[in-house]
């Protein structure tokens, strides 16, 4: 899954199921001495990062036999992992950040207490995978405040409606699309979306403006 130089570098957060170890799958070779570079197909990587416990089976890589599930129990919002990757990789750590785009999945629903073990377990997963909590903490950090002030950090997350859709309701894509269209149609979000697009088109210009 390794790409040639010049292509977009991508990383996915996953968990190694047998030892419950959070890790990262990359389409590039990490030069950091503590990082392990795994070999897998794009399909295997995508399936692994989407294999949420209680909803999907873990994914076994055909070539190596390693078993994986998603990184959501620990890192459903991977912004800290992404920035940590930038900070530790040789050749990247001294570069300025041009733009950070964070896409949320909406606010979580406050469920009533139930005696069903499955419901309790799913409730625990929902609590620990709340990506908005991570977003709020990052936005209030020194780096988050600086990136937001200089129009280099953007967070989009639908505030209402998504919490009523379950993780395995894949047939509800039209409803998700309608909620997203309504959310992005608000004037304030439209302005932020335009600014985000501008930053993504020329992140290097952001770095020059905010050295």
Predicted features along the sequence, with ranges:
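Conserved catalytic cores and adjacent C-terminal regulatory segments
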Residues: 1-211
